[in-house]
């Protein structure tokens, strides 16, 4: 979907609502509140798009995993991993947010992290092998980034029957909470 298509859908879904501002969790890199490249799993036209003009209110845009991380954060050093279509990631250290792009880092001799824990990997590998990969990647990144805990979110995080040690599951409304947090 293009930004125009999504904005049309949002306006239709919120018809009759009054709002003063908009928070957008964007599935890709964001710098200074602006998308840096078109997302891999959506249409073109995101870079340079005028969201303020389209919505007619102030807009803040951050990476979607970063938004969910903000709504999940419980203090200290936390790594957020979003298990959805791809692999989203963000790091929060003592309240300071650092969006990450870990998805395309190499994983063993098996492609990238995303190729082993994204939605296509779940379908290709099956739940048992996919779960093993999630546990392995969580442990690998937890050690490498020296975090106290990992938060797992995204639609496929619910597929995990158990969680790796020092891991929590992000709440369903974490992205919404993160969107509110942006305006504090």
Label every model-predicted segment.
Residues 1, 85-87, 103-111, 172-181:
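Short, acidic/turn-prone active-site loops that include or flank metal/cofactor-
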Residues 1-11, 16-77, 116, 165-184:
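Glycine-rich phosphate-binding loop and adjoining helix at the ATP-binding site
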Residues 1-8, 12, 91-124:
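Short glycine-rich, Thr/Ser-proximal phosphate-binding strand/loop in the N-terminal lobe
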Residues 23-27, 80-86, 153:
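Short beta-strand segments
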Residues 32-33, 89, 160:
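Glycine/Thr-rich phosphate-binding loops of Rossmann-like dinucleotide-binding domains
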Residues 63-100:
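Hydrophobic, well-structured mid-protein blocks that either form specific transmembrane helices
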Residues 130-143:
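A short, acidic, amphipathic alpha-helical segment used as a generic capping/interface helix at domain edges
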Residues 141-175:
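Glycine-rich phosphate-binding loops at beta-strand->alpha-helix junctions
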């Amino acid at each position: 979907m293009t930004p125009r298509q999504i904005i049309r859908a949002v306006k239709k879904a919120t018809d009759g609502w009054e709002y003063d501002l908009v928070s957008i969790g964007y599935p890709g890199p964001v710098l200074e509140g602006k998308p840096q490249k078109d997302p891999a799993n959506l249409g073109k036209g995101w870079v340079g798009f005028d969201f303020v003009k389209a919505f007619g209110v102030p807009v803040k845009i951050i990476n979607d995993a970063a938004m969910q991380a903000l709504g999940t954060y419980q203090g200290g050093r936390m790594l957020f991993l979003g298990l959805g279509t791809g692999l989203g990631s963000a790091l929060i250290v003592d309240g300071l947010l650092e969006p990450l792009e870990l998805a395309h880092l190499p994983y063993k001799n098996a492609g990238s992290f995303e190729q082993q824990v994204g939605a296509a990997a779940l379908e290709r590998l099956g739940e048992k092998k996919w779960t093993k990969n999630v546990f392995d990647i969580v442990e690998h990144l937890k050690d490498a980034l020296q975090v106290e805990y990992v938060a797992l979110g995204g639609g496929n995080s619910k597929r995990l029957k158990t969680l790796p040690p020092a891991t929590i599951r992000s709440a369903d409304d974490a992205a919404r909470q993160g969107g509110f947090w942006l305006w504090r």
